[in-house]
Amino acid sequence: MRSHVNQRHERVLEIVRRRGSLRVTELAGELGVSAVTVRRDVEALAEQGRLTRLHGSVSWPERPRPLGHGPEPTASGTEAPAPPASAAVVLGMVVPSMEHYFAELVKGAQDAVAARGGRLVLGIAHWRSEEDTAQIGRMLDGGVDGLLLQPSWERGVPSTAQEEQLLALRVPAVLVDRRVPLGGRLAGLDSVRSDHVLGGAAAVHHLAGLGHDRIALLAQDNPTSPQVREGYEAAVAARGLSAPPIVSVDPEDPAALEAAARLLYESVADNRITAAIVHNDQTAIGVVQRLREWGLSLPADVSLVAYEDEMAALADVPLTAVAPPRSAVGEAAVEMMFARLGAGPGASAPSRHVSLVPRLTVRASCAPPR
């Protein structure tokens, strides 16, 4: 039995010496054995100093050590640190959708991975938590080195099962554009997100600065909305403004969109509000179209700020809008992952939670109230 293992080890060394570096899954394919077996072989040979093991890949060391010798010590006598992540790195990324918002985020991540010589593998969960699980499993089976995850959490909050899945991952993971619950079990995971609380507050402060004191919020029911609402409510309270009821709206439901637009129209006509923040652009443009049909105009009758800024500039009256830094979030997630991979297996570097500030762009849809 041992002779078979030794023969396989020699074959592993022969392939890696010839190729220079390759992924564990590629090595398993050449040998005709499972990836689990190859990982075991690579770990044994790396401990002997005969190979260099990276996350999900293996390379030929500059100075391979003779059989039976352990890892080469540094000048201080301690074991040399793990090598940094390299061009062999493959990252998996799971997002709930590839609509505009997510497409830009993915593009930012893709460009950042490519700039480092790596590869990004994409999975789309279609807003289903069970599909998150399936995509993550597929990527782990494929031997990815790390995961960038934007889970389909209901209202932005993970269930116990979703938490347990993330805690059990055997590769590093970065949460993307998801807020880690305060004091929750996921606090040890790295995360990077747009600060939608600040984004919602920025919209209120802009309108209040123009003199508006009755500002409505129309928001979708998705993982981002609770944070936009939180920022809206905090800014309204800080400014001492009246707070009209928050309206939830589904832009994909024509009846719901019609009802929300009608409520906004009646609130303007009765002078209950003078301005509105609408999440997202699709909803905002749909509402504006209805208001125009019913005789209201922007910004003469009502001021409006859209939250998302993907197509807000294309409205008949270009909409002032808050833009989450989607591409920058994707780039930052990749940077965070490569830093984690470069620290080596078992490294005790503290986890990082990074939030990026959205940008408000002033266009033609806001003016002081009449």
Q: Predicted segments — roles?
A:
Residues M1-E30, P64-A85, H353:
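Extreme N-terminal segment that seeds HTH/winged-HTH DNA-binding domains in transcriptional regulators
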Residues H4-Q7, T25, E43-Q48, L54, ...:
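Alpha-helical recognition/docking segments in bacterial nutrient-uptake
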Residues R11, Y101-A115, G199-A202, P223-S242, ...:
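Short, solvent-exposed amphipathic alpha-helices that sit
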Residues G92, V144-W153, A216-A219, A269-N280, ...:
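Periplasmic-binding protein-like
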Residues A114-I124, L217, E233-L257:
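Short beta-strand elements in bilobed, periplasmic/extracellular small-molecule ligand-binding domains
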Residues V180-L182, A187-L217, A255-Y265, P324-A343:
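Hydrophobic alpha-helical segments within soluble ligand-binding/sensing domains
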Residues A201-L241, P350-S365:
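An alpha-beta-alpha
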Residues E266-R370:
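Flexible loop/turn connectors
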